[in-house]
Regions:
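C-terminal accessory helical subdomains adjacent to catalytic cores in phosphodiester-
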Residues: 1-6, 17-35, 43-62, 67-204
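Short hydrophobic beta-strand that contains or immediately precedes a catalytic carboxylate
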Residues: 9-12
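Early extracytoplasmic/lumenal segment of secretory-pathway proteins
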Residues: 38
């Protein structure tokens, strides 16, 4: 029996995986058609991309990374050289994957019981910091599970159960299709991943 090919999806960190999985499914990929790997930072992701960018393979390899304030066009030009393999795809979250999370303001509002008008904008830099501050300012006893102030009290970091709560939020409330109209980079990613899936399905 022929074993179906599985797309390899690479992202920067473990906390990105729930969102990336949801985006893949929204683009038409079933859970058995892809696997998401966290590479431990942007430098490692770029290294893996350089190793594979020109290697032909029937297996789709999808790289999803943050722009972190850099110009996405210049970033793509630097990382995706001419002659890139047809099954290598780079999608850039502008500015961070947390921008995609915040783009579904309705889902975010419901999950965290925040007035819709108080959900911070997905646009602009430091989306992660702004998202965590938004939740921390609720002042509830369980907000530290998702967001916490740093030891120096000069910023915000992930809470002790951030990944668990993020996965629950993504499963219960977050919808890529609803977020896409408020995030151009997410909208383009969904379109490109749908096209890749159609090609992948035809090849199978």
């Amino acid at each position: 029996m022929r074993v179906p090919l599985t797309a390899l999806v690479y992202t920067e960190g473990d906390t990105d995986r729930p969102v990336v999985s949801a985006v893949m499914k929204a683009a038409g990929w079933s859970g058995s058609e892809f696997e998401v790997f966290a590479l431990g930072g942007a430098a490692n992701l770029e290294k893996r991309l350089r190793q594979q960018v020109a290697q032909e393979s029937p297996i789709p390899r999808i790289f999803i990374m943050d722009s972190d304030g850099k110009c996405p066009v210049e970033l793509r030009r630097r990382l995706m050289a001419q002659g890139s393999a047809a099954t290598v795809v780079l999608r850039i979250c502008h500015y961070e994957i947390e921008s995609w999370i915040l783009a579904d303001d309705q889902g975010f509002s419901r999950f965290f019981t925040i007035p819709l008008a108080k959900v911070v904008s997905p646009d602009g830099r430091n989306a992660k910091e702004r998202m965590l501050r938004c939740v921390d300012r609720l002042g509830r006893s369980n907000t530290q599970d998702f967001a916490r102030r740093t030891a120096r009290n000069d910023g915000y970091g992930f809470g002790s159960r951030y990944t668990i709560l993020l996965r629950r939020f993504v499963d219960d409330e977050w919808r890529a299709e609803r977020a896409a109209p408020r995030s151009n980079s997410l909208s383009r990613a969904l379109l490109r991943l749908r096209e890749l899936h159609e090609r992948f399905a035809r090849a199978g």
